[in-house]
Amino acid sequence: MNKDQAEKYQERSLRQKYNLLHVLPTLNSRALSGLYYKNFHNSVKRYQIMLPEQLKSGKFCSHCGCVYVPNFNASLQLTTNTEQGDSDELGGESMEGPKKCIQVNCLNCEKSKLFEWKSEFVVPTFGQDVSPMINSTSSGKVSYAVKKPQKSKTSTGKERSKKRKLNSLTNLLSKRNQEKKMEKKKSSSLSLESFMKS
């Protein structure tokens, strides 16, 4: 297998595992979702891929591995960290007063997790084509597609062929002849003007 084929295989297998993780909640199989979750993360480690923070922290249950789907296999509840007494789960920071949190209860394994409430809406910046799984670049890293700064324009094959045609001998001769004709026209008009002035 050459490098391109290996990258395509890697991308295909990771995409399949990722997609299966999203299909498995419909089967209601805790063991199977945990197995695929572990398999997906082992593959990510093997290929040394950096996952976005959205995939690492709050999308999957850390106990059973299923994808959180509200009102299907997870229940959401708005609470404060003082009600729960779980400030350690939010980072162990000493907080001034009660802070809003979202408590996600996994209905498969009955475990709960707290997430910090973010009141501002964060708009992700994506490139033209949103591909949240795998970039097909040579590095094969998993990340969200982001607009890259435009590089200086490089000449394409079409532009190079046009330049070759313009620089051919016949074209150069025809340009030279046209320039001579233009000079004659200008010189004749100049002589007429000079004649009129005198």
From Swiss-Prot:
Keyword RNA-binding (UniProt): yes
InterPro entries in the cross-refs: Rpr2/Snm1/Rpp21 (IPR007175)
GO cellular component: nucleolar ribonuclease P complex; ribonuclease MRP complex
Keywords tagged on the record: Hydrolase, Nuclease, Nucleus, RNA-binding, rRNA processing
Region (Disordered): 141-198
Compartment(s) where it occurs, according to its Swiss-Prot or TrEMBL record: Nucleus
GO biological process: maturation of 5.8S rRNA; mRNA processing; plasmid partitioning; rRNA processing; tRNA processing
Pfam family, one: Rpr2
Composition-biased stretches (Low complexity): 188-198
Comp. bias intervals (Basic and acidic residues): 176-186
Subunit structure: Component of RNase MRP complex which consists of an RNA moiety and at least 10 protein subunits including POP1, POP3, POP4, POP5, POP6, POP7, POP8, RMP1, RPP1 and SNM1, many of which are shared with the RNase P complex.
Function: Essential component of the MRP ribonucleoprotein endoribonuclease that cleaves mitochondrial primer RNA sequences.
Record protein name field: Ribonuclease MRP protein subunit SNM1
Organism phylogeny: Eukaryota, Fungi, Dikarya, Ascomycota, Saccharomycotina
Originating gene: SNM1
